[in-house]
Amino acid sequence: MPGHKSSTEDYFREFRRNTVGINQEYSTPYGIKKIIYCDWIASGRMYGPIERKMAGTFGPFVGNTHTETSETGSLMTWAYHHAQEKIKRHVNAGPDDVLIAAGAGMTAVINKFQRILGLKGCSYPRTSRCLSDTDRPVVFITHIEHHSNQTSWYETLADVVMLEPGRDLTVDPDSLQKALDKYKDRKFKIGSFSACSNVTGVFTPYHRLARLMHENGGLCFIDFAASAPYVDINMHPAEAIEKLDAIFFSPHKFLGGPGSSGIMVFDKSLYKSTAPDQPGGGTVDWTNPWGEYKYVDSIESREDGGTPGFLQVIRAALAIELKEMMGTENIRVRDEELVERAFEGLTAIDGLHILAPGIRKRLGAVSFYIDGLHYNLVVKLLSDRYGIQVRGGCACAGTYGHFLLDVTYDHSHRITEMINNGDLSEKPGWVRLSLHPTMTGEELETVIRALREIRENGSAWSADYTYNRRTNEFRHRDDNGQGMERVKSWFNLQS
């Protein structure tokens, strides 16, 4: 009920209090506003106790890894390995699973994994000069994928097959079975699926998809980027046929996670490489002046060339520790409360349309559009007038957007032709509201009220802004660039 404070809201009060920036204010053309952060699926927020732990406990002993002789080197090496083991336990990795960290999120690790699998090694990708049809890998994806789990596969040797959407645009295992039947002669079959949509928060039955892949001689990889901060991850469920052969996620999306690296965990039997993806320091047992050398046997060490991102992985492990402290069951209950209230409030606003409106069992992601108002104008008005931080656009899920917004082939090509000519004004999109268990009921009521007022007054308020067709952004007429000058000042260590 509006204004009602639940027991789970009380439970998350301390976690909220420790979130860096929870009371941060900033200046807008309409006065000073307090940040109400609703962009969690894009990135998490820093957490005070983790920042203090990084600076006060780990910081004084920071030194390069790859040694267990010096005090700093040995402590950081041990801390790095302990962090890796902690992450593995969290996802119920098995003794034959290995962990590799790379880059800043899931995009980096899935591309690295594709290279490790040898899927980007042919000079003639996606042509008959490289592989026969039966030898060419086939990768099955769904219509809800983030671009990272879609476009990255297009740049491999594999044929990429998008499964037909099920009822209400859900992911239907029957569609996978039909595709597997069609490609039954392929020797190398991969299913790479999102655990959850980053647009609508709708879950996929990924263990059922894993079962089908394994029953048909394939492999199953799962992208947990959107859902990892909120749900249990189990690579090895009770039924072995539903195991996950590889998982990817972005710890920066966790509370306390910004600044961490991308994480993947996979079955070591998939590793066939004779050389690491990035040869370098720490990847060899020995070299000599005659061009001879030997790479280390450990896959995790071999694929961790150079100085590893040990602080990034330590931070990821601490963010996971925080998630475990909050408890996934508590998170689920609070998410359900917030989603239910968001649906009640938003569906009552005339002209506001929620995407995937028939599915309320979802992660805390509610995307919508408002008749007659550009999605980026709505985002700008929420920020300038109310302090509410959301995201507008296609959320790096443009293909899903075609289905959600019923964009036809001809319409799509008219839009893409305009985009190719530098005009983004017809690019479809929506506003994404990300809910988080630390969010209060009062904050959510503010969001609902703000959207109601924007629906009523947005057209008039738009007169304060100019629109740039090339960037698809709105700028307030009184914006004099002071924000950029403020950011520059942040880099002055003497102030």
Question: Over which residues does each language-model region extend?
Answer:
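Pyridoxal 5′-phosphate
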Residues: 1-495
